[in-house]
Amino acid sequence: MEPVKVTLCAYCTECPEVEITDRGVTIGEDENTVRLTHAEWNELVGLIKRGELREI
């Protein structure tokens, strides 16, 4: 799997990033990060797509 890295803000380099690798998904910045397995990430994406998680 080719790693994917996306910043949550296109206007600066200080915002959290989402990094997807063969080992899992990391969301955050510096020490403020959460690590998800691929299964956990897929569940999160599914919840969003099904409308169970929405903008706040």
Kindly give the residue locations of the regions a language model identified.
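Positively charged, low-complexity terminal tracts
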Residues: 1-56
